[in-house]
Structure formats: C-alpha cells, structure tokens
Amino acid sequence: MSAGRNNPLRPASDRRFFPLFKTGVIVPEANTEVFLSSWSSSNESLFDGQFFKVIQFYEIPSGDVKNLLREAGVTLLGYLPRNAYFAAFNQDFNAGMLTGAGIRSIWTIDVDCKLSPDLYEGNIPDHAILEDGTVNVLVNYYSNLDPDQVVGALQGQGLTVIQRDDFGHYINAAVSQNEIRAIAALPFVVFMEPVYPNPEPENYTGRTLHRTNAIATDHGAGRHYDGTGVIVELQDDGIIGPHIDYQGRILDQFLSNNSGNHGDHCAGIIMAAGNVDPLGKGNAFGADLYVYGASPNYPGFSAIPQDYGNLGVRITSTSYSNGCNAGYTTLAQTMDQQVRTYPSLMHVFSAGNEGTGNCGYGAGAGWGNVTGGHKIGKNVIAVANLDYADNLASSSSRGPAHDGRIKPDCAAKGSSVYSTINPNTYALKSGTSMACPGVAGTMAQLFQAYRDNYAGNDPMAGLLKAILLNTAEDLGNQGPDFKFGWGRVNALRAAQVIEEARFDSGSLAQGATKTHTIAVPANVAQLKVMIYWTDYEASVNTTWALVNNLDMTLTDPSSTTWLPWKLSHYPSPDSLNLPAFRGIDDRNNMEQVTLDAPATGTYTVEVVGTSVPQGPQTYYIIYEFIPQEVVLTYPLGGESLVPGESELIRWDAFGVSQTFKLEWSANNGQSWELIAEGLAG
C-alpha cells in the first residue's frame, strides 16, 4: 500500500487519520481488507519471527479489541497520533481474527519517518561527528525485542556499539553517514537521531521563598519535614566535598573526577546542614545523597532501574542541558518511561539559562528555549529561576515545549543562592542550576511529609508533583504561563494539602467518565482544582507528545460548569505572552480550574477519558482552599538572627480585602513596634 505525504487537496474529514511524524504528515490509505486478504510472510522482513507494521484504527481500540489482537498474534506497541500504533505481527498471525476489529489501515513505516529531522535532511550536528568521521546516533528499537539480539544484529551491520540502554530500548552507536538510511530501514529499528550534545552546567533566602523553612521549623511545636530518610540522586560535575555540611549523608559517589564546585553548590541547596554557617542550610537538610557525574550521557539515569530498588533513590536533581528545545527526544521518552514504571520516582531539572535565546520554536528570541529533551518530558519537573522577590531572571528559559505544552513546570529561587563549596565554605551562585536542587530538596521534604502522615508509605510521584504545582504561588500572568509555569513553589501549602488529604484518584479507560465531589467551606478566597496524570511515554517519531488525553470540568453549586485554563501556543511573542483563558486542553497532562471567592457548597469534578490509547489511565485530583487570611511564614520562632544584618519578613495573603500592618516585639509581646502599615494582600 502507499502512505503518501499530506496532500492539501484531501478532504478535511480525513485529517483525524493523519499520523503526525517529525518529518511530515502521512496520509495512509484505508487498505485493511486488501492487506488481510493478500498478505504473505514471504513478503515481510522478519526479525525474531515477527514483522512490524503501523496499524491505524477508526477509533481508539477498547481493551477487548486489544485482547483480540493479542490472541490473533498481534501486539500493539507505541502509540502514534492519530489513532495509530506500531505493532508486532507473529509470522503466523491469524488474519481472519482481525476482520471487524475496527482497523482502517495497515502499512510499513517509511524510512523517512524513522529519522529525526536532522538525519532526514542530512544536517549532522558537529557534536555528533566523531573523530573518525562516523556519526554518533541513538538507535531506538521495538520494546518487545531481546536487546542482545538487536545489538548482535546491529554489530552484524558494521555498527560500533558505544553504549546500550536496555530499559529505554535504545543503543548509542557509531555509523558512517552513508549507512544511516540503511540502518533505519532494518525491520526492528523504530527511530534514529543524533546523540544529544554533551551535558553543560547551567540558601537561605531560597528556603524562606519556597516556604520550606515553614515545614522544617527551628522550634519544637512546628513541622519537622527535613527530608530525613529520603534519598536523592545528584548528577553534576564531579566529586562532592569535603564539607562538614554533608557529614554522614553522602552515601556513595559513582565517579572519580572533580572538575569544579557546581555540584557542591547544588548538593548544598538540596541537603546542606548549615553546620559551619546556618545561612547555608539546604532545603532538605536531613536527606541523603548519591552522586553521579552528568557527563558523558547521564550515567545516573541509566542506573535508575537498579538504584530505585537497590538503593532507594526517589528523587533526582540534574542541572545540565543537552540541546535547546530539542523536542521529544529518546532521553525525554526514557525519563517519562522511568517515572511511569517506578511510580515513586521524580526527575527534577533546571529549565535552562537561554531566556533570551532563539531555539527555533518560531516566535523568535525569548520563547521556546528550554535546554534539553529530558526537560521536555511530560512526567518530570523543569524549574525556572527567580530572585528573592519572585522576579524572573532574564536568563531563565521560557516555554513552550516544541509541541506547545507548558514548560517550565514551576519556579524557585535560583539567583544569588548561598550554598556550599568545598572545602567547608560557601558562595553565591545564580541560574536555573540553583533553582532545580531547591525544588528537588522541597520534593524530598514533601516525600517525608507524606510518609509521616500515611503510615510510612511512599507517595506516588505524580501525586506529589500535582500537589506541588497546584499549591504554587501564581506569578506573572493569571494562571499558568510559559515563564513561571504554574508558579513559585510553596512548601507550606503543599504540606497542608498532604496533611489534610485534599486529593483523590481514579482510573479511566477510553471514553469513560468519572465524577468526584469537593465540599468547599466558607471564607475561601480561592479554590484551586487540578487533575494530573503520569502519562504513557510517547513515540519518539511523532511531533505530539501527549498520549492519553483526559479532560476535566468543575461544576459549582449553581450548576455553572467551568473549563480549565489553557494557553495559546501560536508561535508569536504576542500570542505566547497572553494570559491563560478557559478552554479544552489537548496537549498537557495536567489541567487546573481556579475560582476566586467560591460559594460555599458541593462542587463536582467530571473527568472524561477523551482519548486513552494506552489505558487504563490513573489520575489524581488535587484541591486547595486558599483562606482569606494573612499567614506569617518567616520568621516563625527559634531562628538564629544575626545582629546588624537585614532580614526578609515573608507572609502569604490572598483575597484579604483590608490592609494590615506589621509589628515586632522584643519582649515577648509586652510591647510592639511598627515595621510597616497599609500592606495589602
């Protein structure tokens, strides 16, 4: 059959059947009857007793249809928007059983659709050309195959295997440029792309800005979520330490080089104890750390399948880049797959320091410049860079992701962060490199908060991420935006959601609907409701990263239905800078509805499985009630304040209609002195 390039003369009704590949849009013929009646195994390229096709359905197949295909000897693999899947056919599959399965088209994927745009166009990036002139590529293969067989077959074709990732189903290899298309044509190859660039590196006021001080207080009556018992993995520039702030809590370092103090600084932001200088205390000063180098090729990520179970790693922190708005790469796919497979794992990344750069999104300089495919993943966290007063650094990378999704995810302090460098001293550094470990440390604190409140059980990482995003302080434009993401992290509000169990969960198959109810009390300044799901990893071939699409609405006691916030992703500065508006979101794996001054009563959340090709899909509903009150968050009591030094006083206030004043007492409240008045919420 033929699967031609998109013809603009095709009727618009056909567009729902146009698979979206990175090198173009394919228009497959409706050929199922012809294929099933005339196919022959002698015409197929077999590998391990199988041949591989793309199957496109008229509608997303149900679980019963998928089971029928398995019984017939056909296994659906990665999803391709729209309504299509890679599929493995046993050489003796039962063609008759596929009749009536709602299959529109079956075809062999073209070599062009197996290549990244760079390889397709012959534009090999300099970083991917090795000294001998060969090209360093990543070769993706089908997930149901034996990695040893694939490696052997590639070596038989003359490839030099540099590294393999059996979990991610890809191989790092060297190939001559004139053999690229021949390798892509092999039946077991799904996709090829150049290796990503070598990784490049990209706190006292940070703790109070994030409100992490408020959940790890210095007085006995407060919260004490300091990350104790939580294990974080750091990938950076070399050996960490020596520094007394890490004493006994760096469990192992899987590297032998030391090329700077970038990693020391990031480690301190995560977990420094502040032993030499209390101002250098990290966010999760009770957490433990494993250390890997970031170069070459992020070895810590390759070790996750072992380290998650054997070492107990639950959070990773990586403040390194690998290309600018690189799209949904092999590494992005692997990150999403790891978080889906290991449900209490969360990867945290810096968004990047290319805020004024132009990375080809189409809107010119200043947009679409998040630095690296791994940060573009759906199930991970990418962090923007703020100063102490919630101002965005001009260097902080902006979204959207290549396909219009919201990035960065959230924001944290990354400018002039005071943290450890070796030996036993401290320094100020700036960048999203510093914001990333701040959020990794905050996540470690929230991880402990969940364990402490739920019988020692680990939280699902998707739930914790959703709580972090839904409780973030909205900055910039109303709602989410492409600069701050969902806002600046607020650990205090996140911990309160955990303690008060303001969340629910469910699971949906294709086309199903579920409802949840929320009882909203009086005197709420703002209601925030978010749905989040850890999405299935996308196929690297496609331009569209979202696989399972759920849709949420919120209905208030007066029966008014509210849609979630969404953003315009049209590639122009004016469009990308517009405030969020209410609408149906089909790109992101999270949606949020907010209502100011909500009426007291019962609200209904409806969730629809609009498109669930890799289901059933688990999701989380998180809700927050922001009260009409002023909450002091620093100082809280017990802090050691240095005479003569300036201190920032921080509070949270939303929906407070009247102004208020700030006073302090030096004699336990017997008398008060004015600091400021006429303050507004």
Feature map (PLM): residue ranges:
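Substrate-binding/access-modulating region of protease and related hydrolase catalytic domains
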Residues: 146-152, 156, 171, 178, ...
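Hydrolase catalytic cores
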Residues: 294, 412-478
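C-terminal subdomain of the subtilisin-like protease fold in secreted/lumenal serine endopeptidases
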Residues: 280, 448-524, 542, 580-583, ...
